[in-house]
């Protein structure tokens, strides 16, 4: 697939694939909007579908980290062109890249300077790291690609806004695109069509555990495979969720740390080279700068901004509650606009929770935003939002988690395109409602399945949490997906809490996916957040009950990935059982315990008797009194030449220069020995004749 590849692939090459995917997914409304927005036409029915490409890529990606063509790392442009050889796979991967760089690219378009400078700087690093992270990056790109289908479904107007920047970014960031794209393409060329599709899954895997992509891939692969089986959107969501699930895990332990850690994390991901291509090129640029910032100032523009995030983390974390909105507004009007808009929307549903969570997200966002590297800020912000989300999750305030999720979404998007934020905000006002409504309606059905998966992902993510901490910041898509995941797990909880409301949370999920997919979809974020927060209010009681059931529901979702309906039914049943079955199970447990207690006394007696007998025997044994000897002298044969290690036993000792010293020192031990030896060295010691004779023992090599 890489053999045809000198044709430049553009995002529009993927439009037919996405359009077909939408139609196959029975998203006719979204498909029609997408077709109108992009002017895409139906693809040849015989051509590979996104799912085919994705499945092929998934199967190949797990087997072929080999695609990390380090030799081609520098030649990412060629690799990119090579990947263009397969329009479907490469287009999808590159579309992902460009859509993924719909986040970065828009950043690049808005930040052409940063794109050209950091990304070129990131090129070398990205190429080097891309060779190691090319798979992850390609996977990530494909995830982005699949997120884009979701986004394009939900945020088609935004997609329009995003794609022009993406194209511009392509021209301006052709280098960075080629780097990031080529890294994915390097991998994709070999398994381009399937890889394109599989990339999303593999990306999720790799991204889920950037530090340990291989491990993350299998786990995520399973979750993703299930997700994809339920529905491509659900697979996208599940991928995002899995990625995000890992980020939330990171975030759970660290809320405020996120602000401080974001830059470090961004740097760490870069170092790990687990960053996705977008993140690898941009984030590596930015993150390397953070890394260098740690070591020293970085020449590229982003670094100075990264220090700001470092400074802000401590202050902003404290300020989260009080100055959250204000800092966000003051620091980045555009990004804060989207933040504030999303926050305002969030506030109506859950004013108290939202104000706190948004503030946290905003400071983090601010910090990240202050850094010129949107990728760095994206990753750090994503991590920070994810952490607040995770934190809220642990308390299990239904409303709070959702606002945090929404905020997380808003934050990532804002970071994703700090420059794009104005655009995204415009898109928000114009198309956020439409996108969110349509995407919510369509996604409601798919996300019903995705929700359980998302929860499953969240659960699986905890194990991945540490690796992914780097992974989140490592890639924008990771961070965005993590944010999406954060949101997703919460909507899933809502779904589980309210089976009827499943469709509603699902829209939230899709909105989340959209928003995370493209920075321009912040409007969809806002709308989705609003919806989410409104839903939280209604579903809060149910959510709380479902949280108890949330685990079973997610487990069921894992088992029930077969069909969304089954998942929904299981969720509903579990919800019902949450209040009833769990208490019942507790009673059963108590009964079982009582039964155990009845039988235990006998067992205990038996056990007690046995131990009492053995200790007596052991005490009676002589071994207890004798000290333990690993080596018994009587059983070991020692060579006569080394049996005696004293000075006198050495050959040539008699009449030697050190003989007189030995006469004094052989009776001396401890500190006094060193003292005496030093006196001999410093004083006027004169022993016997100094001999050059070799008295060492030579052992035969037997």
UniProtKB/Swiss-Prot annotation:
Positions of modified residues (Phosphothreonine): 594, 610, 613
Sites bearing N6-acetyllysine, chain numbering: 33, 421, 666
Cross-link Glycyl lysine isopeptide (Lys-Gly) (interchain with G-Cter in SUMO2) residue location(s): 68, 77, 195, 201, 351, 356, 396, 402, 407, 413, 421, 447, 459, 582, 607, 616, 650, 666, 698
Modified residues (Phosphoserine): 88-89, 92-93, 371-372, 375, 563, 585, 625, 646, 689, 701
Pfam families linked: SRP40_C
Family note: Belongs to the NOLC1 family.
The protein, known as: Nucleolar and coiled-body phosphoprotein 1
Originating species: Mus musculus
Gene from which the chain derives: Nolc1
């Amino acid at each position: 697939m890489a053999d045809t590849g000198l044709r430049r692939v553009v995002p529009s090459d993927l439009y037919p694939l996405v359009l077909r995917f939408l139609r196959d997914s029975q998203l006719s409304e979204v498909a029609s909007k997408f077709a109108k927005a992009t002017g895409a036409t139906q693809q040849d029915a015989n051509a590979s579908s996104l799912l085919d490409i994705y499945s092929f890529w998934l199967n190949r990606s797990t087997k072929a980290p080999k695609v990390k063509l380090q030799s081609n790392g520098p030649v990412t442009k060629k690799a990119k062109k090579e990947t263009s050889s397969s329009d479907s796979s490469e287009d999808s991967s590159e579309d992902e890249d460009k859509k993924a760089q719909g986040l970065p690219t828009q950043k690049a378009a808005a930040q052409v300077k940063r794109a050209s400078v950091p990304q070129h700087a990131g090129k070398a690093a990205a190429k080097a790291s891309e060779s190691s992270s090319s798979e992850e990056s390609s996977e990530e790109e494909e995830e982005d690609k699949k997120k884009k289908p979701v986004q394009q479904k939900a945020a088609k107007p935004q997609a329009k806004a995003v794609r022009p920047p993406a194209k511009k970014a392509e021209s301006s960031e052709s280098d960075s695109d080629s780097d990031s794209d080529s890294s994915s393409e390097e991998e994709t060329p070999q398994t381009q069509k399937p890889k394109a599709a599989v990339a999303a899954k593999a990306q999720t895997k790799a991204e889920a555990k950037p530090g340990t992509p291989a491990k993350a891939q299998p786990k995520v692969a399973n979750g993703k495979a299930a997700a994809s089986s339920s529905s491509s959107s659900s697979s996208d969501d599940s991928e995002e969720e899995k990625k995000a699930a890992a980020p939330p895990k990171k975030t759970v332990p660290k809320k405020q740390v996120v602000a401080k850690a974001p830059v470090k994390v961004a740097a760490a991901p870069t170092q790990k080279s687990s960053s996705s291509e977008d993140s690898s090129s941009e984030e590596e640029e930015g993150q390397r700068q953070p890394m260098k910032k740690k070591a020293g100032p970085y020449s590229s523009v982003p670094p100075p901004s990264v220090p700001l995030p470092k400074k802000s983390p401590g202050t902003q974390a404290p300020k989260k509650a009080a100055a959250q909105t204000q800092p966000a507004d003051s620091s980045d009007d555009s990004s804060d606009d989207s933040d504030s808009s999303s926050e305002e929307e969030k506030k109506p549903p859950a004013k108290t929770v939202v104000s706190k969570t948004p503030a946290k997200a905003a400071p983090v966002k601010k910090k990240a935003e202050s850094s010129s590297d949107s990728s760095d800020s994206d990753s750090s912000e994503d991590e920070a939002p994810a952490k607040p989300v995770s934190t809220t999750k642990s308390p299990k305030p239904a409303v709070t988690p959702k606002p945090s999720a929404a905020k997380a979404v808003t934050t990532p998007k804002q970071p994703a395109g700090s420059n794009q934020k104005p655009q995204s905000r415009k898109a928000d006002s114009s198309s956020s409602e439409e996108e969110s409504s349509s995407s919510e309606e369509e996604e409601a059905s798919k996300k019903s399945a995705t929700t359980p998966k998302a929860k499953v992902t969240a659960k699986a993510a905890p194990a991945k949490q540490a690796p992914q901490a780097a992974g989140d910041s490592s890639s924008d898509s990771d961070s965005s997906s993590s944010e999406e995941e954060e949101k997703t797990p919460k909507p899933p909880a809502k779904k589980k809490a309210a089976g009827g409301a499943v469709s509603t949370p699902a829209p939230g999920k899709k909105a989340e996916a959209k928003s995370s997919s493209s920075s321009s979809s912040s409007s969809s974020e806002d709308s989705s957040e609003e919806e989410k927060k409104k839903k939280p209010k209604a579903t809060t009681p149910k959510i709380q009950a479902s949280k108890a059931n949330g685990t079973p529901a997610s487990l069921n979702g894992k088992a029930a990935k077969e069909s969304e309906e089954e998942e929904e039914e299981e969720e509903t049943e579990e919800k019902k059982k949450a209040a009833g079955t769990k208490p019942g199970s507790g009673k059963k447990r108590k009964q079982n315990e009582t039964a155990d207690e009845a039988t235990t006394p006998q067992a205990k007696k038996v056990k007690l008797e046995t131990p009492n007998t053995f200790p007596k025997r052991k005490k009676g044994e002589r071994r207890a009194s004798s000290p333990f000897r690993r080596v018994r002298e009587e059983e070991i044969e020692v060579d006569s030449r080394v049996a005696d290690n004293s000075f006198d036993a050495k050959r040539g000792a008699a009449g030697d220069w050190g003989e007189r010293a030995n006469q004094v020192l052989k009776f001396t031990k401890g500190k006094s020995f060193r003292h005496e030896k030093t006196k001999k060295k410093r004083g006027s010691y004169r022993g016997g004749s100094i001999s050059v004779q070799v008295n060492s023992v030579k052992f035969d090599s037997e």
